[in-house]
């Protein structure tokens, strides 16, 4: 499988090489807010779930625990996904489809279809240039089925200007709705202040949209 190139991949490979996963500034032992929104969707166990920017997230562990059988974990960093595979172990890792790709320049994601749930915690807000944001939206629209759900969590307007040394494009629910456009209905949203492993507060906006057409 070809690897995505460019500074984002190099940055995230360095991050996952240089720190224990549970010390990273976005680590969650239990991703409760994402799970809450996912469970609201009423998905079947074979419905296709695509997690964008998986990293070494425990969300995949929890989705497997919940009995989901059609999960794709995607990240620009192969090192991040390898860390997650190692934690899951061979048997559980074999139940997940793994895609190393850049959502803004997809080589593999763009071929997916009929995704029932697009989940993104903290990818979109790293895309600060309009062409990147448009490419992200193009990928989302290409793969997510009508009637499917998009759960997006990003740094809130009141949050930090940078994460992991990179600049951030911050959002609230209105800005996310404007970004996705009128083909997406905002069904739920809430603010949540996450605390990093070192104790620093990070205000997020969590949203759940349904694709109408």
Spans of model-derived segments:
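A conserved beta-strand element that flanks and buttresses the S-adenosyl-L-methionine
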Residues: 119
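Short catalytic micro-motifs in class I SAM-dependent methyltransferases
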Residues: 122-126
């Amino acid at each position: 499988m070809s690897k995505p190139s460019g500074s984002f991949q190099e940055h995230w490979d360095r991050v996952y090489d240089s720190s224990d996963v549970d010390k990273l500034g976005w680590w969650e032992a239990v991703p409760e807010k994402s799970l809450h929104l996912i469970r609201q969707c009423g998905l079947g166990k074979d419905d296709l779930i695509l997690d964008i920017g998986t990293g070494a997230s425990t969300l995949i562990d929890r989705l497997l625990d919940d009995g989901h059988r059609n999960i794709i974990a995607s990240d620009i960093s192969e090192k991040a996904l390898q860390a997650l595979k190692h934690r899951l172990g061979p048997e559980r890792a074999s139940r997940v489809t793994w895609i190393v790709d850049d959502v803004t320049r997809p080589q593999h994601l763009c071929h997916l279809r009929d995704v029932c749930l697009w989940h993104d915690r903290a990818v979109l807000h790293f895309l600060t240039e309009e062409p990147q944001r448009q490419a992200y939206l193009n990928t989302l629209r290409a793969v997510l089925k009508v009637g499917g759900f998009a759960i997006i969590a990003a740094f809130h307007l009141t949050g930090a200007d940078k994460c992991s040394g990179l600049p951030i494009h911050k959002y609230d629910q209105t800005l996310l709705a404007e970004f996705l456009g009128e083909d997406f209905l905002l069904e739920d949203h809430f603010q949540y202040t996450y605390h990093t492993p070192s104790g620093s507060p990070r205000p997020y906006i969590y949203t759940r949209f349904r694709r109408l057409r």
